Amino acid sequence: MLDTLLINIGQLLTMDQEDGLLRREAMNTLPVIENGVVGIENDVITFVGTAEEAKGLQAKEVIDCGGKMVSPGLVDPHTHLVFGGSRENEIALKLQGVPYLEILEQGGGILSTVNATKQASKEELVQKAKFHLDRMLSFGVTTVEAKSGYGLDDETEWKQLEATAQLQKEHPIDLVSTFLGAHAVPKEYKGRSKEFLQWMLDLLPEMKEKQLAEFVDIFCETGVFSVEESKEFLLKAKELGFDVKIHADEIDPLGGAEAAAEIGAASADHLVGASDKGIEMLANSNTVATLLPGTTFYLNKESFARGRKMIDEGVAVALATDFNPGSCPTENIQLIMSIAMLKLKMTPEEVWNAVTVNSSYAINRGDVAGKIRVGRKADLVLWDAYNYAYVPYHYGVSHVNTVWKNGNIAYTRGEQSWSTATI
């Protein structure tokens, strides 16, 4: 006898087509079972099929989904989850046209977050991050990548990574930890970026030993770290056993996309300024293009990443929130789906694949997350929607009814039984 049986599922989005990254037409294809049923036993999916195929199955608990839609738990592969403070005080300055460099000189911008993160205790960072994870869960997300990067020194970077490790034990969402010590060049290292990168590299052996990070990331952009610096840094991280990511071509076509493909990065993220050559190289690689349209939207920029061109050329595209206090303060992956549809010209089918299958591969979780398949963890979302196109179409709200994490109900609309986080 099964533990749980979900019946009367109007559309069951299994996302279970070919293994590996989805490209071109595969991105525009959604495996959907009409009148579907999912069986769960010992926190694992044990049955996926139609109501006809499920005849005779029995379970301790039978949940009637009322003809609504069920999908896998969503995957957010790019967030800056652990940080101190917030930066709503900068909104008026931005609207007045005050340049970012001037905001920095006033102690704002990333420096404000760095200072707040340094001053916060680990427990304060954990509690604040729990609050944000709770929201992510309520939007249907069950797997999240979490970066450090608001320390720019060893002590605070360790604190962020240790906070992430604690969150992994205390919150139902699965976390994937990324070391982003090379997020910016601190003032005291101005003009000495190579020395700073060496300092960050010196932290990696102990980080690997303590298993505090799975990925290493770097911000490759004009005025921060060059393409050559980024490649050298990430290749050394790979030699130490880390997988790598790169913040690439967010503003300028610097060559970050090309570098990511060349060194075999798991993902290249942002890519607003990616060149035609960079897109071509990504299409011929296993590097996922993780696009962050919420950031472009919040920064009030006109030019978005060329998502349509990337997909048409064969790039494996994923979507993420880029949740952070400065350029994209939202946990709402559903809003990102809507923006991607409208501004990146992605179809609803492509959007769904980009927040499940491809996003799971962007963080090396393609074998465990992003699909409803027998043998996988029962990470499921019941939606207050009867078809998949409705979710990105009706934007700005959450359509989630219930979230199951490892077969257990982790969120139900109107209830917050998963955490007592405060902010």
Curated annotation (Swiss-Prot):
4-imidazolone-5-propanoate binds at residues 87, 150, 183, 250, 327. Pathway: Amino-acid degradation; L-histidine degradation into L-glutamate; N-formimidoyl-L-glutamate from L-histidine: step 3/3. It comes from the Bacteria. Fe(3+) binds at residues 78, 80, 247, 322. One of its GO terms (molecular function) is imidazolonepropionase activity. InterPro entries: Amidohydro-rel, HutI, Metal-dep_hydrolase_composite, Metal_Hydrolase. Binds 1 zinc or iron ion per subunit. It is found in: Cytoplasm. Zn(2+) binds at residues 78, 80, 247, 322. Gene3D superfamilies: Metal-dependent hydrolases, Urease, subunit C, domain 1. It catalyses: 4-imidazolone-5-propanoate + H2O = N-formimidoyl-L-glutamate. One of its GO terms (biological process) is L-histidine catabolic process to glutamate and formamide. Keywords: Cytoplasm, Histidine metabolism, Hydrolase, Iron, Metal-binding, Zinc. Its cofactor is Zn(2+); Fe(3+). Pfam families: Amidohydro_1 (PF01979). GO terms for cellular component: cytoplasm. N-formimidoyl-L-glutamate binds at residues 150, 324, 326. It is an enzyme of class 3 (hydrolase). Its EC number is 3.5.2.7. NCBIfam families: hutI. Belongs to the metallo-dependent hydrolases superfamily. HutI family. Catalyzes the hydrolytic cleavage of the carbon-nitrogen bond in imidazolone-5-propanoate to yield N-formimidoyl-L-glutamate. It is the third step in the universal histidine degradation pathway. This is Imidazolonepropionase. It comes from Bacillus cereus (strain G9842).
